[in-house]
């Protein structure tokens, strides 16, 4: 990704803080919406969600200014690096501190989440490799492909350019997986 024009300035720090603040507000408001819905306040839940969507757009605006959004390859690489930091440094350090301060249950949660973050990194790196080796929609062996729009199933080494049932483009195909 390109460097941002604010590098090293107070404005860059302000943009980073604005991005973090808007991102946190968005998440909080989605949690608050769930509580309001459970308590029977549909309108309030909807307003929390509407505001959360606004906060998401504010955060996106600041993140774009920071040149934080690239193409999919760049985004996958950045996501993998972020997940790597979380599991190798952040959560490990948090767990050690929690343990030292007498919070072993919280330390265990930090470590458990760290393991999940490691899986996230592996997933992003695998997806990045698929793009780099042109294997997103074509594999060396026969696979089962499913259209994410209509559910049409195709067996072969490559997803069709266009779904023969719903006419959606190849980008709607993924490897079919049963999880039940």
Q: What would you call each of these model-derived segments?
A:
Residues 1-180:
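Non-heme di-metal
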């Amino acid at each position: 990704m390109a460097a941002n024009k604010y590098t090293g300035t107070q404005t860059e720090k302000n943009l980073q803080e604005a991005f973090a603040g808007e991102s946190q507000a968005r998440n909080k408001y989605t949690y608050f919406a769930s509580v309001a819905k459970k308590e029977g306040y549909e309108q309030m839940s909807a307003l929390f969600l509407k505001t959360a969507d606004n906060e998401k757009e504010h955060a996106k605006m600041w993140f774009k200014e920071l040149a934080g959004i690239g193409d999919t390859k760049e985004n996958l690489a950045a996501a993998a690096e972020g997940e790597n930091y979380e599991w190798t440094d952040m959560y490990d350090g948090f767990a050690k501190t929690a343990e030292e301060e007498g919070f072993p249950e919280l330390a265990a949660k930090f470590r458990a989440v760290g393991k999940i973050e490691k899986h996230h990194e592996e997933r992003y790196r695998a997806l990045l490799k698929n793009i780099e080796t042109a294997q997103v929609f074509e594999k060396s062996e026969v696979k089962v492909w499913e259209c994410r729009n209509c559910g049409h199933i195709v067996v072969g080494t490559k997803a069709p350019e266009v779904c023969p049932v719903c006419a959606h483009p190849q980008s709607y195909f993924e490897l079919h997986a049963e999880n039940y």
